[in-house]
Design a protein with these regions (language model features):
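C-terminal motif of bacterial Sec signal peptides marking the signal peptidase cleavage site
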Residues: 5-8
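N-terminal secretory targeting modules
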Residues: 11-163, 167-192
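Conserved SGNH/GDSL esterase-like catalytic core that processes O-acyl groups on lipids
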Residues: 57-59, 173, 182-275
Length: 276
């Protein structure tokens, strides 16, 4: 069992971002931080060495608007497991309808199709990560289409930050229930977009971001076996990335959220039973 702590924060003054700004149409997006064309979700950072925007956290991703029939991305996948993503087109809500699986690219950027075969016209696509931060990440260098990119759609006026563990990340939500199942935490059985965080945000018409992963504690840790907890590493872009070791820059909190939800208890309690 666990407990959720909820805290409201002072949000941004702007009720929306994107959507209402007229911008020149472009054929390719090579700067994913350009808010005129791209909405980013979650804690993401640009990797200077590999020259790509890093998407590592559950439910992180991007959203854009274009005129055409298909969109592709030049990306590099890193990690020990497949990286699985959901694509939503024109307001779709089923996270299992369009699923992408990216396998290891050996450090090389390759062109991957995100969506194709759409009717020729204006579309909005959102691409979000299903899998957790400790097993995979992708870096995106550029996004292209067979048409033109237009101004990014409006983002929700409310953004919620969730801090938690496997339950928050939706790990194992797609498995058949078994009391003991070694396969319950695989890329195929995980979907952060079907976690309580996703459903809560949907009910509130909010965007959301997740910081955490399966097995992580909020505070307690054994320094001999556990490098991080949420509390001792929340200044990072992901719970298992070290700012001190140069894994990523320190997180920039200038982008405020409207509420913070902290999932308390489960792993901290289990560790307390193991260690005095």
């Amino acid at each position: 069992a666990g407990v959720c702590a909820f805290s409201a924060c002072g949000g941004n003054d702007d009720s929306t971002s994107g959507g209402n700004v007229e911008v020149p149409e472009i054929e390719k997006i090579d700067d994913l931080t350009d808010e005129r064309y791209v909405n980013l979700y979650g804690r993401n950072f640009y990797n200077e060495n590999l020259e790509g925007m890093t998407f590592i956290n559950s439910a992180s991703g991007f959203e854009l608007k274009f005129r055409g029939t298909s969109v592709s991305a030049k990306l590099c996948k890193i990690g020990s497991r497949d990286s699985m993503w959901s694509v939503f087109v024109d307001g779709e809500t089923d996270s299992n309808a369009r699923v992408l699986t990216f396998t290891d690219t050996k450090g090389v950027f390759i062109q991957e199709t995100l969506v194709e075969g759409l009717s020729d016209g204006e579309h909005i696509i959102k691409v979000l990560k299903r899998t957790p931060s400790n097993f995979d990440r992708i870096l995106v260098k550029e996004i292209s289409s067979d048409g033109m990119f237009t101004a990014a759609p409006e983002k929700p006026s409310v953004n919620i930050a969730f801090y938690g563990d496997s339950i928050t990340c939706g790990e194992g939500v797609l498995r058949d229930y078994k009391p003991s199942d070694s396969a319950k935490y695989t890329a195929l059985t995980q979907n952060a977009l079907q976690s309580y965080a996703a459903y809560a945000a949907d009910k509130l018409n909010a965007s959301y971001e997740i910081f955490g992963r399966g097995g992580i504690t909020l505070k307690f840790r054994n320094p001999e076996t556990e490098s991080y907890s949420v509390l001792n590493n929340y200044m990072s872009y992901a719970v298992d990335l070290s700012v001190a070791n140069g894994d990523c820059p320190e997180y920039d909190f200038s982008s405020t959220v409207d509420a913070v939800v902290i999932y308390l208890g489960t792993n901290d309690y289990l560790r307390s039973l193991k260690y005095s």
